[in-house]
């Protein structure tokens, strides 16, 4: 596989942004060690925005010949008050539920979970020189920049926070350099931390990424954040600027079960959630169901996606590209309920291996029922 084919895999949907493609090409050309990582807070049940979006991208990285790593951010979850702020509970959930759920998610999206390295943050944070890296990075970042970066924790700028949360962004940047990561991967909401990593890369004294004497800047790959199924906090949305302002409130949330489908939901739960989903007729710009169709169903194109309808409503229709489906929906030729039903059945089939695994091994879900899921 040549360099351009590997770059195409990195750019493939659900990727929304690569910082930068030029640097990615440079890393390929000089033969630098390609180490990917994506970090997750341990905060509750895995929904499709976490499991399938990240799983799909991990599969792409593997096909491009890049080593993949999932970072189970237990300390970060503790700092951010997840699972009641209990570190031992967070660690137990990370290893007994989250790791297994991500392995299964990667598998259904075409990846090889056995080739993914899972690392618990504690394993590296307890080494003394990790904190040298945190301080080294911190000395190159202003306090105002850190305050602007707390949005990576799902916090709002100006929100009252404890001091530990100001350390979090610098830890996230340190995770990249301490692990020798050349490709930092996350959802678009983690962009601020990755931009800091790129900017400080050549200034670091402790754990810079060096290849043949050159200090390397990491590449940041940001995937699309699936919209939650709930109605937006404001409707109609009048402009792209307005959409950007409320987009964080429109993503899937573990604390709002009807905004998300979880990887182990039953067929009945999936159908009910899609039935209740916000999907206004002819609306193609701010429509969560269409968003899911674009990034889950039509990740690969062409793909055959059949929508079953009674003959009196036009009969079955098959689409091979998202643009075809989007056009029919915009013109009112495709009814929202028919689309919702088809997406529900698609997800039921896609998630069947995960569902069956947890039916055979119920212990992880039993553990989750016993813990306090916060935020």
From Swiss-Prot:
Species per Swiss-Prot/TrEMBL record: Pyrococcus furiosus (strain ATCC 43587 / DSM 3638 / JCM 8422 / Vc1)
Family: Belongs to the class-I aminoacyl-tRNA synthetase family. TyrS type 4 subfamily.
Chain sites annotated for binding L-tyrosine: 37, 168, 172, 175, 190
GO cellular component entries: cytoplasm
Subunit field text: Homodimer.
One GO process term, biological-process aspect: tyrosyl-tRNA aminoacylation
Entry's Gene Ontology molecular function annotations: ATP binding; tyrosine-tRNA ligase activity
Name of the protein: Tyrosine--tRNA ligase
């Amino acid at each position: 596989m040549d360099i351009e084919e590997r770059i195409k895999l990195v750019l493939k949907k659900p990727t929304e942004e690569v910082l930068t493609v030029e640097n990615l090409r440079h890393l390929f050309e000089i033969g630098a060690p390609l180490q990917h990582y994506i970090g997750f807070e341990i905060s509750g049940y895995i929904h499709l925005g976490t499991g399938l979006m990240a799983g799909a991208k991990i599969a792409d990285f593997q096909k491009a010949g890049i080593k993949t790593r999932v970072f189970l951010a237990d300390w970060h979850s503790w700092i951010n008050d997840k699972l009641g702020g209990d570190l031992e509970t967070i660690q137990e959930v990370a290893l007994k539920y989250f790791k297994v759920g991500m392995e299964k998610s990667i598998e259904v999206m075409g990846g090889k979970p056995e080739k993914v390295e899972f690392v618990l943050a504690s394993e590296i944070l307890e080494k003394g020189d990790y904190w040298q890296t945190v301080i080294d990075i911190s000395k190159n970042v202003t306090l105002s920049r850190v305050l602007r970066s707390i949005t990576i924790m799902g916090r709002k700028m100006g929100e009252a926070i404890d001091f530990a949360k100001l350390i979090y962004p610098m830890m996230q940047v340190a995770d990249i350099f301490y692990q020798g990561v050349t490709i930092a991967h996350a959802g678009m909401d983690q962009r601020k931390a990755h931009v800091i990593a790129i900017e400080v890369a050549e200034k670091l004294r402790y754990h810079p990424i060096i290849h043949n004497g050159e200090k390397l800047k990491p590449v940041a790959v940001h995937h699309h954040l699936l919209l939650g199924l709930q109605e937006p906090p404001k409707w109609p949305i009048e402009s792209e600027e307005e959409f950007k302002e409320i987009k964080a409130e429109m993503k899937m949330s573990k604390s709002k079960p009807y905004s998300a489908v979880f990887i182990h939901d039953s067929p009945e739960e999936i159908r009910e959630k899609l039935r209740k989903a916000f999907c206004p007729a002819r609306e193609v710009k701010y429509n969560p169901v269409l968003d899911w169709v674009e990034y889950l169903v039509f990740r690969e194109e062409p793909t055959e996606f059949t929508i079953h309808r009674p003959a009196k409503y036009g009969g079955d229709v098959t689409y091979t590209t998202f643009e075809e489906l989007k056009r029919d929906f915009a013109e009112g030729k495709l009814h929202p309920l028919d689309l919702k039903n088809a997406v529900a059945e698609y997800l039921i089939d896609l998630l069947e291996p995960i569902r069956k695994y947890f039916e055979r091994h119920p212990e992880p879900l039993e553990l989750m029922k016993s813990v306090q899921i916060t935020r």
